[in-house]
Curated annotation (Swiss-Prot):
One of its GO terms (biological process) is translation. It comes from the Bacteria. HAMAP family: Ribosomal_uS10. The keyword NADP does not apply. Keywords: Ribonucleoprotein, Ribosomal protein. GO terms for cellular component: ribonucleoprotein complex; ribosome. The gene is rpsJ. InterPro entries: Ribosomal_uS10, Ribosomal_uS10_CS, Ribosomal_uS10_dom, Ribosomal_uS10_dom_sf. This is Small ribosomal subunit protein uS10.
Length: 104
């Protein structure tokens, strides 16, 4: 059962962990004989919050918080059955979210 392309999207709050996971996936795919397009860095989403430090007085004193979500995308072409099996056996770190789509 061969597919034309597999698209993998990875998300993480830690870019080092994300790059390590991408490297692991790329090495696994190349070892099975398939080719990889990417990793393509996607835009980083930033969420920011401003909170008052004191609830009653000193309105000018505020704290700023930010969370950054880093994203990468991989396209795997010329897929073999060994590629699919090896991708299913990879164990990624807990801080990485992965989304896999198969396209025909």
């Amino acid at each position: 059962m061969e597919q034309d392309k597999i698209r993998i999207k990875l998300k993480s709050y830690d870019y080092k962990l994300l790059d390590q996971s991408v490297k692991q996936i790329v090495e696994t795919v190349k070892r099975t004989g398939s080719s990889v397009k990417g990793p393509i860095p996607l835009p980083t989403s930033r969420r920011r919050w401003v909170v008052l430090r004191s609830p009653h007085k000193f309105d000018q004193s505020r704290e700023h918080f930010e969370i950054r979500e880093f994203k990468r995308m991989l396209d795997i072409v010329k897929i073999t059955p060994q590629t699919i099996e090896s991708l299913m056996e990879i164990s990624l770190p807990a801080g990485v979210d992965i989304e896999v789509k198969m396209r025909g």
